[in-house]
């Protein structure tokens, strides 16, 4: 498995790789290749981590390069992968390579490698660019990374188009994303399998509220309904839409807003009252924030299938989000959450006000949300379906190779 992010878990892709790997059956050998992260390797100076917390013994981790969130570090990791991954694959007699949508295998040719490659499509440059162009017309608060995506979008989009070809096989985490790949990239539908990401509903659970109160006593003392925004402080996440909605909410009812996530606070005008700003939080913190919150809000302009929504639903939060990407596949509007149009601060304010004022509605929505996650989103099942897809791909690849070699 090739991934730009892994341990320590700081994003949805890293968590996806972790959960799929550790939920495979015991006889599946998994070798994860990822950039080096010094905090993880402090006690492992050889750069190879055979086991780590939460990893079973059949999972090995090799660190190549250094972790970073920048485009140029992504390119560096692609170069490193092109040099070392074929060697690792031959030495360990790898049956299949599973890559992620940051395209770490961009410079590796599946036909030359003679090993099938499956890529999970989490997001696309094109999708980001379209959302940011729309946001830029009504907002001047784009983050530096968002401005870079707008600037380089056309170039990166061409690189992306060269990657998404019928030489590879694909997993998408939503039906919406599968259709995007068919329509925009011309990928054969038979080469795409939809396998949803999931949530660990034992970790993300309202039963952890006492732990949460001990961890955040100042939030536990807040009596007003608590509204959590836990995501990157970025325009494409609808941050400025939320900030425009908050004054309208507070003019009608009482509520307390909690902001947590990566990004610089000064880039956005925070409300003058009724809020707590936590900034970037460690990976063990989100379950406590969900458990303490009544409402979760993610007013994104572009998403695929955001894990944070499932985590909030598992925690019995009433979720308010937008009708973009795969989100409508996750939420049944009015039953286990609320869906609104993107970039609509008035609709957002109305929905937040209604939920803040109606405790019974919040509770019913949260209960149905957790039931939905438990019934539909199980990591063990997702890992099993992923393994089944691997087996199908390997069988197809072997058949085509035998036909080619005659």
Identify the meaning behind each predicted range.
Residues 282, 301:
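Aromatic "clamp/platform" in nucleotide-sugar-dependent glycosyltransferases that forms part
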